[in-house]
């Protein structure tokens, strides 16, 4: 009996240890203490409650003092698709300007006729046609005879200056005009700058005849310019400046030295 008692005690201890092993361990106490300054904020509680209640693809905006999405719906939402025109750039409609009223000569004449019919006073037209213009242009054969301005045969207008110019002055003038009038009284008018010369018949103002430079009958190729030696056409002739002939290069060189000394 005494031997069976300790065996029974041992078996009871084994059974109790097996029962303790089958039961789950008790939960450990939560030792994490969150900071009350951050997680106790009402904004954080609202944010966590929203995150738990609403999925991420729903339309909600974060509450923050500087959020620009508080009053606007979420642009990342896929439940409300945007129309195609939402992504297209808006192009303003072009302004259409009315074409101005364009009037031609015929419209002006019609308006003038209508105004003249309705009003008693005549309307002065600003448009003149070529058929209504009465301008008589004398022909070239009658020029100077049918015009209103007439002068005696040898009388000139007081504004015309008559003077005799030298040949050198005429050559230097750049403005030169010659007018020939045909008809019963043909005249030739020469205009040199500010001077006017009229050549008419029977009396006329004599024009200065340019004096022709009398060239010597002897050509410059017939005699040497330096030594005055007659030049033979069969021999070489040296020319200087196109107007002086020489029999040799020495005579031409002497003339070239003289020209350099003079200049």
Swiss-Prot record:
What is the protein named?
Answer: Protein MARD1
Answer whether the UniProt record assigns the keyword Metal-binding to this protein. yes
Gene behind this chain? MARD1
Which UniProt key words apply to this protein? Cytoplasm, Metal-binding, Zinc, Zinc-finger
Where's it mainly located? cytoplasm
Name its species: Arabidopsis thaliana
Check the record and name the PANTHER family matching this protein: FCS-LIKE ZINC FINGER 8, PROTEIN MARD1
Q: Where in the cell is it found?
A: Cytoplasm, Stress granule; Cytoplasm, P-body
What's the short name of a Pfam family annotated to this entry? Answer: zf-FLZ
């Amino acid at each position: 009996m005494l031997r069976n008692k300790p065996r029974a005690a041992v078996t009871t201890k084994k059974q109790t240890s097996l029962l303790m092993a089958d039961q789950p361990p008790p939960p450990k106490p939560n030792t994490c203490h969150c900071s009350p300054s951050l997680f106790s904020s009402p904004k954080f509680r609202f944010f966590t409650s929203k995150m738990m209640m609403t999925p991420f693809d729903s339309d909600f905006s974060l509450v923050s003092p500087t959020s620009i999405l508080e009053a606007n719906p979420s642009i990342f939402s896929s439940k409300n698709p945007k129309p195609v025109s939402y992504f297209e750039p808006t192009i303003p409609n072009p302004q259409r300007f009315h074409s101005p009223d364009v009037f031609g000569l015929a419209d002006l004449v019609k308006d003038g006729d209508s105004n003249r019919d309705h009003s008693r006073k005549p309307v002065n037209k600003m448009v003149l046609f070529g058929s209504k213009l009465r301008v008589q242009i004398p022909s070239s054969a009658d020029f100077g005879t049918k015009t209103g301005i007439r002068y005696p045969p040898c009388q000139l207008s007081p504004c015309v200056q008559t003077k005799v110019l030298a040949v050198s002055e005429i050559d230097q003038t750049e403005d030169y005009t010659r007018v020939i009038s045909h008809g019963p009284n043909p005249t030739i008018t020469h205009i040199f700058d500010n001077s006017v010369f009229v050549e008419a018949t029977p009396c006329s103002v004599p024009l200065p005849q340019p004096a022709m430079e009398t060239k010597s009958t002897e050509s410059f190729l017939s005699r040497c310019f330096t030594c005055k030696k007659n030049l033979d056409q069969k021999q070489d002739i040296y020319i200087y400046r196109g107007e002086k002939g020489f029999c040799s290069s020495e005579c031409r060189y002497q003339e070239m030295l003289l020209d350099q000394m003079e200049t």
